[in-house]
Regions:
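N-terminal basic, amphipathic alpha-helical segments
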Residues: 1-130, 335, 339-346, 367, ...
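Conserved core of the PLP fold type I
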Residues: 136-274, 286-303, 373, 463
Length: 469
């Protein structure tokens, strides 16, 4: 055993024995080198090895810390079977009942689609918004119509460039949140009655858009760890005249899955070979827990077939409703559809976010947000282990703020939703994530709020209800 491996094993034993607990800082490189009589390079090699094994993680300018994720005691949810038919979509009534459930401020919002506002820099944004409103040039009503505020588009393009993706700001269109971007993309490439490949389970807003546009869904199974099943998608592309594919490639809602880079590249190539556009919903991309943001599928697009959609709603400012789309070869058509519907998003909101991106410390905010979300995930996973049946299967995503739970087979998540709501707890039942209303024994839980005694009590109550089935 090499010296760095021996030192790594010594630290690993301290973690396994509980001497170094989850979230606790491990000795600094300098301290470890002096205390244990090893060179700094040996310590670095040991820590790198422990990081690869998932036992510790580095925080920029803070050192190394014990990973909050112990090896998961849960099995992964089972991958759904492929449905070999297209289907019309009718889920809105069910979705609206879930959305209504989170309006009561006294309800524990495990069914919400947003993180807590407490996690966002709202006072700093408010100052930017007030300044933008005071200084707004009346001519911006004309000059900042679609494609949107030039400074904001420039800032977004710069963030992509830092991540290694050269995305010209001329391709970027600012929208009223990502949902409008996704609507516009579908309208640009489909007609009523067309077939669209979607994930199963899929974000319910995707299903509602298909329902509104009178499109049919072809459901493709999703693996809880690495995303959409490419073999199933390839079969569907051979069998059906699919006009578009809509997928979340990073930290998918509701499962939390992220396609590895090679799989994203394969997805783009598969769709390119059939000349089918990919609508990439990438709204959770900034909420990664590791050291590096996942690369979007758009990075592998060479023919302009990927329509990449993003938003600040999940990472910075939910109420501002500012999103964007880089629509590739469809950019002009999408922009014209935008001009025919809502002209442009709020100009003060665009200017405020542009100012914050330039001056407000967005990356510092994101580091704090990611850390908070990862800690909250650990708290919810621990609560599930304490209170839920042993056969519960749980996803464990490396970003975002959702867990997908597959409960014992006899559990009816629609009844569970009503029973939990009567106790002041909102959840998202599985059937709202499927065009065919499958996943009856599954639920999605949101851990995007600071963990409190009320959160813990709600999980205990929820676990007790699940056990009653």
């Amino acid at each position: 055993m090499k010296r760095y491996e021996k030192f790594a094993e010594d630290i690993a034993e301290l973690i396994r024995s509980g001497v170094l607990g989850p979230g606790q800082r491990v000795p600094s490189v300098r301290y470890a080198s002096q205390t244990y009589g090893v060179s700094p390079s040996t310590v670095f090699q040991a820590y790198y090895l422990l990081e690869r094994r998932g036992l510790i993680r580095a925080r920029p300018r803070s050192g190394y810390f014990v990973n909050t994720h112990a090896p998961s005691p849960f099995s992964e949810p089972v991958v759904s079977e492929q449905v070999h038919e297209s289907t019309e979509v009718d889920v809105s009534e069910l979705v609206f009942s879930v959305l209504d459930s989170i309006k009561d401020p006294n309800t524990v919002p495990f069914g919400s689609a947003f993180p807590s506002p407490m996690l966002f820099p709202l006072p700093r944004l408010a100052r930017s918004l007030a300044s933008a409103s005071r200084e707004m040039d009346p001519r911006l009503v004309v000059t900042d119509m679609s494609p949107g505020n030039p400074q904001l588009r420039r800032q977004i393009a710069l963030r992509y460039m830092v991540g290694g993706l050269m995305l010209p700001m001329e391709e970027l269109l600012i929208t009223n949140g990502a949902l409008e971007a996704l609507n516009l993309c579908l309208q640009a490439v489909t007609e009523p009655g067309d077939l669209v490949a979607i994930e199963a389970p899929a974000f319910y807003a995707c299903l509602q858009v298909l329902e509104r546009l009178k499109l049919k869904a072809v459901e493709i199974p999703v693996h809880p760890r690495d995303g959409i099943d490419l073999n199933a998608l390839a079969q569907a592309l051979e069998r059906y005249p699919i006009k578009a594919c809509w997928t979340m490639t990073s930290f998918q809602n509701p499962m939390g899955a992220t396609l590895p880079e090679a799989k994203k590249q394969a997805l783009v190539e598969l769709l390119r070979s059939h000349q089918v556009p990919l609508i990439e919903d990438d709204v959770y991309a900034e909420l990664y827990y590791g050291q590096q943001a996942p690369k979007p599928a758009k990075a592998f697009d060479t023919e302009g077939l990927v329509m990449h959609c993003g938003s600040f709603a999940k990472s910075l400012a939910p109420g501002y409703r500012v999103g964007w789309v880089a629509a590739g070869r469809y950019a002009q058509k999408v922009e014209r559809l935008k001009l025919m519907t809502s002209l442009c998003p709020s100009m003060p909101a665009q200017a405020a976010i542009a100012d914050y991106l330039q001056h407000g410390g967005y990356d510092r905010h994101l580091r704090k947000l990611r850390y908070a979300l990862e800690e909250q995930q650990s708290a919810m996973l621990a609560a599930i282990a304490r209170y839920f049946p042993a056969q519960t299967r749980v996803s464990q995503p490396a970003g975002g703020y959702f867990l997908w739970l597959e409960l014992p087979e006899q559990t009816d998540s629609l009844k569970l939703f009503q029973m939990a709501l009567a106790q002041g707890i909102s959840i998202a039942p599985g059937p709202i994530f499927s065009a065919t209303q499958r996943f009856r024994n599954c639920i999605r839980l949101n851990y995007g709020s600071p963990w409190t005694d009320a959160s813990e009590k709600a999980m205990e109550t929820l676990g007790r209800i699940v056990r009653s089935f």
